[in-house]
Swiss-Prot record:
Protein name (Swiss-Prot/TrEMBL): Cystatin
Annotated tissue distribution: Expressed at a low level by the venom gland (at protein level).
Further remark: Negative results: the recombinant protein does not inhibit calpain-1 (CAPN1), a C2 family cysteine protease and legumain (LGMN), a C13 family cysteine protease. Does not provoke cell death (PC3 prostate cancer cells).
Principal location listed in the UniProt entry: secreted
Alphabetized Pfam families for the sequence: Cystatin
Disulfide bonds: C91-C107, C120-C140
Amino acid sequence: MVHFQLPVAAPLCLLCALLLLPSATMIPGGLSPRSVSDPDVQKAAAFAVQEYNARSANAHYYKELRVVEAQSQVVAGEKYYLMMELVKTKCAKTAGKPKVYKEIQNCELPPKAQQEKLTCHFQVWSRPWLDKTELTKMSCN
């Protein structure tokens, strides 16, 4: 009788062992949490802010207050899913003279009571071997 239960017990034990694996185990192609201070996340965030400013019709630049949450996904490169807080600066945009990220981050802010903040969700797709980074999705409110 024990002989017939062994083939059933082995797969059951394997299933239980798999369920006990840490939830942070990376699933190929799945989303993985990333530290907001990770250098690759910071690089993607800087790119997102620069692209936001290039695409927005605002007369002033917005700069990064903080990265709230970051995830990444391996997809023919790496796609970063970022939730960020941006704030409107006193730096006005000048036609033909766009500022780079570091310049934008040095822009002064209005007094706290007058600050305009945005929460933005960005998707940044990085393919370093092609020297290519794209902002594939952006929504702010």
